[in-house]
C-alpha cells in the first residue's frame, strides 16, 4: 500500500526543523571534520575520514529524502466540523473486550511513534476508525485474529 501524504502541522514543522538542522548545522560540521581528517594524509586507513565520509552520505541521503517529502506532504489542520467523529489528527480512547482502555492519536506515516501511541493513518486500526463516533464499535483483523474495539472518547489538539 502506498504511503499517504498527510501530516499534522507539528509533524511537518519537526521534519522541516530536522532538514534545516542537518543542512545548516550538522553537514558543515561533518564537512569540516572530513577536510581536517583528509589533511592528515593517507585516507585509506584514516578512520575519522572514512567515518566522516559515511556520515556525510547519510546526511545527504536524509536531506534529499526530507526535501522531496516535504514538497508532497499535505498539512491537515483541525477543523471544528471534525468534533465528535474520528478524523486525521484525532486522539481516540479505545476499549477492548476485556475492558482495557488505551489512547491513540492518528497521524501521518512520517510521524507515527508507538512510544507515544501515535498510529499511522495507513494502519488497519486507523482506517477502521475514520468517520466513526463515540460508542461505535470497530472490528480489526490482526495476526492473532479479529479484535473488537469500542470508541469511548474522541478529542483533538487545537
Curated annotation (Swiss-Prot):
GO molecular function: DNA binding; RNA polymerase binding
Keyword annotations: Coiled coil, DNA-binding, Transcription, Transcription regulation
InterPro entries: GreA/GreB_C_sf, TF_GreA/GreB_CS, Tscrpt_elong_fac_GreA/B, Tscrpt_elong_fac_GreA/B_C, Tscrpt_elong_fac_GreA/B_fam, Tscrpt_elong_fac_GreA/B_N, Tscrpt_elong_fac_GreA/B_N_sf, Tscrpt_elong_fac_GreB
Cystine connections: none
Endpoints of the signal sequence: none
Source domain of life: Bacteria
Similarity comment text for this entry: Belongs to the GreA/GreB family. GreB subfamily.
Protein name: Transcription elongation factor GreB
Organism encoding this protein: Pasteurella multocida (strain Pm70)
Amino acid at each position: 500500500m502506498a504511503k499517504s501524504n498527510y501530516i499534522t502541522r507539528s509533524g511537518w514543522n519537526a521534519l522541516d526543523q530536522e532538514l534545516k538542522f542537518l543542512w545548516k548545522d550538522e553537514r558543515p560540521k561533518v564537512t569540516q571534520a572530513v577536510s581536517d581528517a583528509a589533511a592528515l594524509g593517507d585516507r585509506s586507513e584514516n578512520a575519522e575520514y572514512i567515518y566522516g565520509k559515511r556520515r556525510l552520505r547519510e546526511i545527504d541521503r536524509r536531506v534529499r529524502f526530507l526535501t522531496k517529502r516535504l514538497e508532497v506532504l499535505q498539512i491537515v489542520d483541525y477543523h471544528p466540523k471534525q468534533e465528535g467523529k474520528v478524523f486525521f489528527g484525532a486522539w481516540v480512547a479505545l476499549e477492548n473486550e476485556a475492558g482495557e482502555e488505551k489512547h491513540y492519536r492518528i497521524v501521518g506515516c512520517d510521524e507515527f511513534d508507538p512510544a507515544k501511541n501515535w498510529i499511522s493513518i495507513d494502519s488497519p486500526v486507523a482506517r477502521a476508525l475514520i468517520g466513526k463516533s463515540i460508542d461505535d464499535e470497530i472490528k480489526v483483523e490482526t495476526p492473532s485474529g479479529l479484535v473488537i474495539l469500542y470508541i469511548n472518547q474522541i478529542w483533538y489538539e487545537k
